[in-house]
Structures are given as structure tokens and as C-alpha cells.
């Protein structure tokens, strides 16, 4: 299982820095998209599926929190979402958590916090995938039984 990751930040050096501290392939991840702001990320998400979004909180055009709220409200993506922030203000973290943010990571982002996030997402995704497989199996059994009777 490979985790499809999108990185969203208006600072190119941050995007580059996020892709360097770990070997994404080794942790079974693939960076499928980098976006310079929430609006660009939103447009990508309307047409493409990702498993994890790491987004800066403060960006022009659309902030990370606005992106998170919009994709949840419009049911565009159920990807796991982590906010990257230079602010340790509780109100930002509270708003992010209210919108189903899986993690609120303070900048500068450490290698350890990225690896911990990836492990967390991998475990959650495995459980979700298993639940989905069980649901589909039960659906098939139900259909077969009803067709046979």
C-alpha cells in the first residue's frame, strides 16, 4: 500500500524542505502533487485522489484551514489532513481539529514528526481499507443470498 501525498505551501523552499528529510519511497509514500496555495490544491483535488494532505496554514488566495473546511464541506476529499504552522495559537489548532485535521504540526517540521504522521496515517488507512473490504464482502454475501432465495 502506497500513501499518495500532496504538499501545499506558498514557500518553494518549504515544499523542497518537506520532500528532503525522509525517503518517501522507503516509508511507502509518493508525493503526487505540490501546490503553491489552497486554491491550486482544491482544483487538483476536484479531479484527483490523495491519501494525505500537508498544508501550510497561511497562504495567499486560500489558507490551509480554508482548504480543509472547503473540501470537507463539499465532500471533495476525505484525505487525512495535517496543518503546518508557525503559529502555536490554540484557536488555529482548535479550528483545524473541528474540521477533522489529523495533525497540527509546528514549523520547522522535524523528520520525526513527519515519520510519526506517516505511521499514524498508514495505520488509519489500513484499518479503513480493511473495514471497506469487510463491508463489500458482506454486501456480496447479502446479494448472493437474496438472489438465491
Give the positions of each predicted feature.
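Two-component/phosphorelay signaling modules centered on CheY-like receiver
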Residues: 12-33
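Short amphipathic alpha-helix used as the core "switch/output" element in two-component signaling
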Residues: 43, 65-76
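Receiver (REC) domain active-site loop signature in two-component systems and cognate sites
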Residues: 59
Amino acid at each position: 500500500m502506497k500513501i499518495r501525498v500532496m504538499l501545499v505551501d506558498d514557500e518553494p523552499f518549504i515544499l523542497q524542505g518537506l520532500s528532503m528529510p525522509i525517503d518517501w519511497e522507503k516509508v511507502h509514500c509518493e508525493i503526487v502533487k505540490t501546490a503553491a496555495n489552497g486554491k491550486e490544491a482544491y482544483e487538483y483535488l476536484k479531479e484527483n485522489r490523495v491519501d494525505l494532505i500537508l498544508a501550510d496554514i497561511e497562504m495567499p488566495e486560500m489558507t490551509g484551514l480554508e482548504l480543509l473546511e472547503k473540501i470537507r464541506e463539499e465532500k471533495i476529499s476525505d484525505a487525512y489532513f495535517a496543518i503546518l504552522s508557525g503559529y502555536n495559537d490554540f484557536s488555529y489548532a482548535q479550528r483545524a481539529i473541528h474540521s477533522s485535521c489529523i495533525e497540527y504540526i509546528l514549523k520547522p517540521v522535524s523528520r520525526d514528526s513527519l515519520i510519526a504522521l506517516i505511521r499514524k496515517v498508514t495505520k488509519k488507512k489500513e484499518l479503513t481499507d480493511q473495514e471497506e473490504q469487510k463491508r463489500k464482502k458482506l454486501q456480496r454475501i447479502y446479494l448472493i443470498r437474496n438472489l438465491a432465495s
